[in-house]
């Protein structure tokens, strides 16, 4: 027993000693490379899509730019790798990307079986259905016997089966490998309905030949907590990815914006002072400079600003805040205290 305890103690000591060096691996690699490798969508309006000049925009894209701003004080130091639903986890597991921010649903199997950690939920979503108005359908419960276009390898495909089985309805699943293929098939008339996350329905509807001819049905059939993912084994990197989101949400709560962040440096509010690095050394605890959150807000803005310009009232999608509003206004976005 004594020999066992000594051996266990030595093993624990070795693990503790090795821990910090391993924990810094991703951050060190990102700094040495000079840019963040971000896994993004292949093209989803409002979340991750390149414009005509190849510049990436979207809510998820700005999450990655915020990470780069925190590290480099430069939101442009990001390489975006477009990934399909089928390839996204492999790319993260293999080290091709440092972080995956690609409207990905956090589920138990993904969290416990893929060697990944999921960060804060940057968009609370739920699965819905898009149909043609001429189908004269006002509820998903009227879709019995319908053909439904769905993307392969997604929680969407599984939820679709669950919903129709639970409601004792028949349907034909028409499956495609990519989001673009799925949308094009629906637009061409291959299917009666198209299903994905509700945010995606509003985004993809913009791509249709006649967007006004299609409606999103009222039913939300699932919970889709969307957020970033990182590999297991690097707690410091996981902390960085988490706290970037919390900083943006906290900034919105305290009224700190891209426009007033310099003025807010003079605030007497201790929470704002800690957020912006004017008090305490919280940046150092995650391997960053103490003005890491100031950098994020100066370059990107707070969570509300990012939401509004990408998917909210200031965007073509015009999605209401809903569950993604601040906790003080009936939403679920809630910043962990910096103290």
Locations of the language-model features?
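Bilobed "Venus flytrap"/periplasmic-binding protein-like clamshell domains
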Residues: 37-46, 56-71, 105, 125-181
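Acidic, polar ligand-binding/catalytic clefts
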Residues: 65, 69, 73-142, 199-220, ...
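Cleavable N-terminal signal peptides
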Residues: 9-11, 21, 30
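Extended ligand-binding regions for polar small-molecule ligands
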Residues: 62-65, 69-71, 134-137, 141, ...
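Sec-exported extracytoplasmic/periplasmic mature domains
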Residues: 31-32, 68-73, 93-97, 134, ...
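Extracytoplasmic small-molecule ligand-binding "clamshell" domains
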Residues: 23-101, 288, 303, 326, ...
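Bacterial N-terminal signal peptides that target proteins for export
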Residues: 1-8
């Amino acid at each position: 027993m004594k020999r066992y305890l000594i051996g266990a103690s030595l093993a624990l000591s070795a693990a503790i000693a090795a821990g910090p060096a391993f924990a810094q691996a991703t951050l060190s690699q990102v700094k040495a490379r000079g840019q963040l490798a971000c896994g993004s969508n292949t093209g989803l309006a409002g979340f991750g899509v390149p414009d005509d000049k190849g510049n990436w925009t979207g809510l998820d894209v700005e999450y990655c730019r915020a990470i780069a701003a925190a590290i480099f004080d430069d939101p442009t130091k990001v390489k975006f790798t477009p990934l399909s639903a089928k390839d996204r986890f492999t790319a993260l597991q293999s080290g091709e990307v440092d972080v995956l921010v690609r409207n990905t649903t956090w589920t138990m199997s993904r969290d416990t079986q893929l060697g990944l950690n999921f960060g804060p939920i940057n968009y609370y979503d739920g699965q819905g259905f898009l149909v043609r108005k001429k189908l004269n359908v006002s509820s998903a419960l009227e879709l019995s016997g319908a053909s439904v276009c769905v993307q392969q390898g997604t929680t969407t495909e599984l939820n679709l089966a669950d919903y129709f089985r639970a409601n004792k309805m028949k349907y034909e699943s028409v499956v495609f490998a990519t989001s673009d293929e799925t949308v094009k098939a629906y637009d061409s008339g291959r299917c009666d309905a198209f299903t994905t996350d509700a945010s995606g329905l509003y985004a993809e509807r913009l791509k249709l030949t006649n967007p006004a001819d299609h409606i999103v049905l009222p039913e939300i059939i699932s919970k889709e907590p969307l957020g970033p993912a990182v590999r297991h084994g690097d707690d410091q990197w996981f902390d960085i990815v988490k706290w970037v989101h919390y900083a943006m949400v906290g900034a919105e709560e305290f009224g700190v914006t891209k426009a007033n962040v310099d003025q807010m440096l003079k605030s007497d509010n201790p929470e704002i002072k800690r957020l912006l690095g004017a008090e305490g050394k919280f940046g150092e605890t995650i391997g960053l400079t103490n003005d890491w959150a100031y950098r994020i807000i100066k370059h990107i803005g707070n969570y509300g600003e990012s939401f509004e310009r990408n998917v909210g009232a200031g965007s073509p999608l015009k999605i209401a805040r809903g569950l993604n509003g601040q906790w003080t206004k009936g939403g679920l976005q809630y910043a962990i205290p910096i103290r």
